[in-house]
A protein has these predicted regions:
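Small/aliphatic-rich secondary-structure junction motif
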Residues: 2-64, 88
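Hydrophobic structural packing positions in well-ordered secondary structure
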Residues: 5, 22, 85, 110, ...
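Amphipathic coiled-coil/heptad-repeat helices and related helical stalk/stem segments
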Residues: 15-18, 106-107, 136
Length: 156
């Protein structure tokens, strides 16, 4: 039976390194999900209240244009990652792209997804230095603590 692998994915170089590592190391019969947590901007971008001030409306439009561009960049990065996996021998139908709006926080949302039947979680390491990482933490550290019963691979 093939493993279900969850790769926490954004458009960062670290996430791409995690994909490249999976492409090199894991058996090609795995089922891979590239999972992205995205800001829930629908409530802001779909807001068309007549009470909006002209200033807020102009700022809303600018914000929504930027958010749409970010989503396009993420989609392009997901397709690039899928291409890397396919080029390494995974079949197209073994790879799923999944994006969910942020509900409880990036790490909590990744952990919640991991608890839906995955055998392995793969994360890229952000690479904060020293004291900053100690105080701020990181998504990978939080996922480690929230999904302790799952195997987790953190790629630097």
């Amino acid at each position: 039976m093939s493993q279900k692998v969850l790769i926490a994915f954004d458009d960062s170089d670290n996430a791409l390194r995690a994909v490249e590592y999976v492409a090199k190391v894991l058996e090609k019969d795995c089922r891979i999900t590239l999972f992205s947590v995205v800001p829930d901007t629908a409530s802001i971008c779909d807001l068309h209240s007549p009470e909006l001030t002209p200033y807020f409306k102009s700022q809303q439009d600018s914000f929504c244009v930027l958010e749409k561009k970010k989503q396009e960049l993420l989609s392009a990065a997901q397709l690039k990652a899928k291409g890397i996996l396919v080029a390494s021998g995974f079949q197209q139908d073994q790879i799923r792209l999944k994006s969910e709006p942020k509900k409880k926080g990036i790490a909590r949302d990744i952990a919640a997804e991991a608890h839906t039947g995955y055998d392995l979680i793969v994360l890229g390491r952000r690479g904060l230095a020293g004291i900053k990482e100690l105080f701020m933490g990181s998504v990978s550290q939080k996922v480690l603590s929230l999904a302790q019963e799952k195997p987790i691979l953190i790629v630097s």
